[in-house]
Curated annotation (Swiss-Prot):
<protein>
    <recommendedName>
        <fullName>Heat stress transcription factor A-7b</fullName>
    </recommendedName>
</protein>
<dbReference type="InterPro" id="IPR036388">
    <property type="entry name" value="WH-like_DNA-bd_sf"/>
</dbReference>
<comment type="subunit">
    <text>Homotrimer.</text>
</comment>
<dbReference type="InterPro" id="IPR000232">
    <property type="entry name" value="HSF_DNA-bd"/>
</dbReference>
<feature type="compositionally biased region" description="Low complexity">
    <location>
        <begin position="1"/>
        <end position="11"/>
    </location>
</feature>
<feature type="region of interest" description="Disordered">
    <location>
        <begin position="1"/>
        <end position="24"/>
    </location>
</feature>
<dbReference type="GO" id="GO:0003700">
    <property type="term" value="F:DNA-binding transcription factor activity"/>
</dbReference>
<feature type="region of interest" description="Disordered">
    <location>
        <begin position="117"/>
        <end position="139"/>
    </location>
</feature>
<dbReference type="InterPro" id="IPR036390">
    <property type="entry name" value="WH_DNA-bd_sf"/>
</dbReference>
<keyword id="KW-0238">DNA-binding</keyword>
<feature type="short sequence motif" description="Nuclear localization signal">
    <location>
        <begin position="208"/>
        <end position="212"/>
    </location>
</feature>
<dbReference type="GO" id="GO:0009408">
    <property type="term" value="P:response to heat"/>
</dbReference>
<feature type="compositionally biased region" description="Low complexity">
    <location>
        <begin position="120"/>
        <end position="134"/>
    </location>
</feature>
<feature type="short sequence motif" description="AHA">
    <location>
        <begin position="259"/>
        <end position="268"/>
    </location>
</feature>
<feature type="DNA-binding region">
    <location>
        <begin position="26"/>
        <end position="120"/>
    </location>
</feature>
<comment type="similarity">
    <text>Belongs to the HSF family. Class A subfamily.</text>
</comment>
<keyword id="KW-0804">Transcription</keyword>
Length: 282
């Protein structure tokens, strides 16, 4: 090899990479979080705050259930908070989930590349185990993170308890409605049975109710005013048909069996059942 060529090769400066060629871009977590916070359609759940220098998760429950799965492969809010901590985000409000990072600003996506993920620094070989142990478990770094994670877990537990209470209240309300419907059905069936066995029962109750209504109308208005009825329920039609009334008109006007009539009818039915039971016992 020519000595002159080798000397020239040694004197040449090393190649310089083009500026920005090897520059790493922002992490997918940061870009997805930036897009998520900037979506105007979900500002009621998560949005920018303080003029765009911080962001707030207004509704953590809806955030975990609807937004996180769209951007990440999980719906765990505490895991999302831990990720923010690893990238240097700080929780700046005690009463709400508001986070801040100097490189995470509204409308400045290019600053995301300045946010670096925290990594545990390796200890120098000269340090022994007792010297490196405090750096690996620095209370000043771990305790705030543990407090935030505990707060997240307590919030999730509180949300689950509230949902459980609402579910129990709904089940109890449904049970009451079902029991009420079953009780009313039993009364109706008992009444129909007694009406078949005693044809005069319905007519007597119907006439008593009519007499009381007429007396009340006379006392209040001084005359009898009959109101036209357009509809009869199936049960009312059945009861009238059993007594031969059908849909007959009295003086050209239909009469309606309202809820008060059926309540009175069922009360009389219950009283009659009690009287029969007493007679059987005697």
């Amino acid at each position: 090899m020519d000595p002159s060529s080798s000397s020239r090769a040694r004197s040449m400066p090393p190649p310089v990479p083009m500026e920005g060629l090897q520059e790493a871009g922002p992490s997918p977590f940061l870009t997805k979080t930036f897009e998520m916070v900037g979506d105007p359609n979900t500002n009621h759940i998560v949005s920018w705050n303080r003029g765009g220098i911080s962001f707030v998760v207004w509704d953590p429950h809806s955030f975990s259930a609807t937004i996180l799965p769209l951007y990440f492969k999980h719906n765990n809010f505490s895991s999302f908070v831990r990720q923010l901590n690893t990238y240097g985000f700080r929780k700046i409000e005690a009463e709400r989930w508001e986070f801040m990072n100097e490189g995470f600003l509204m409308g400045q996506r290019d600053l995301l590349k300045s946010i670096k993920r925290r990594t545990s620094s390796s200890s120098p070989p000269s340090l022994n185990y007792s010297q490196s142990q405090p750096e690996a478990h620095d209370p000043g770094v771990e305790l705030p993170q543990l407090r935030e994670e505990r707060h997240v877990l307590m919030m999730e537990i509180s949300t689950l308890r509230q949902e459980e209470q609402r579910a129990r209240g709904y089940v109890q309300a449904m049970e009451q409605r079902i029991n009420g419907a079953e009780k009313k059905q039993r009364h109706m069936m008992s009444f129909l049975r007694r009406a078949v066995e005693n044809p005069s029962l319905l007519q007597q109750i119907f006439e008593q109710k009519r007499d009381r209504e007429e007396a009340a109308m006379i006392d209040q208005a001084g005359l009898i005013k009959m109101e036209e009825v357009e509809h009869l329920s199936e049960l009312e039609a059945l009861a009238l048909e059993m007594q031969g009334y059908g849909r007959q008109r009295t003086d050209g006007v239909e009469r309606e069996l309202d809820d008060g009539f059926w309540e009175e009818l069922l009360m009389n039915n219950e009283n009659s059942d009690e009287e029969e039971a007493n007679v059987k016992q005697d």
